[in-house]
């Protein structure tokens, strides 16, 4: 059963501007430690796709970034096959547990000017 869905479209220019203003602080504020370690240098599209995934996940949880849920509580990682996946930590994990989330589906894409993500939470 579908418990939540979320969609986000992020402008690459917005992420580029944030990186130019705060090249160290911005990624540290939104990325989980494992994502920081995997972040390609100066990859706006990579970062924008993760930003979109986190926004979409927060929407699917129904919380947005309130109630203690933070960007760093939502981790995007890749399976060995290269498939992108989501993992919840902290308040996001607790909320997903309360909802009865058993499976998380994530789809990412990016083009010249935008990155997008869709998240489906299944129970």
Swiss-Prot record:
One of its GO terms (molecular function) is holo-[acyl-carrier-protein] synthase activity. InterPro entries: 4-PPantetheinyl_Trfase_dom, 4-PPantetheinyl_Trfase_dom_sf, ACPS, Ppantetheine-prot_Trfase_dom. Disulfide bonds: none annotated. One of its GO terms (biological process) is fatty acid biosynthetic process. It catalyses: apo-[ACP] + CoA = holo-[ACP] + adenosine 3',5'-bisphosphate + H(+). Its EC number is 2.7.8.7. Its cofactor is Mg(2+). Keywords: Cytoplasm, Fatty acid biosynthesis, Fatty acid metabolism, Lipid biosynthesis, Lipid metabolism, Magnesium, Metal-binding, Transferase. Coiled coil: none annotated. It comes from the Bacteria. Mg(2+) binds at residues 8, 55. GO terms for cellular component: cytoplasm. It is found in: Cytoplasm. Belongs to the P-Pant transferase superfamily. AcpS family. Transfers the 4'-phosphopantetheine moiety from coenzyme A to a Ser of acyl-carrier-protein. This is Holo-[acyl-carrier-protein] synthase. It comes from Oleidesulfovibrio alaskensis (strain ATCC BAA-1058 / DSM 17464 / G20) (Desulfovibrio alaskensis).
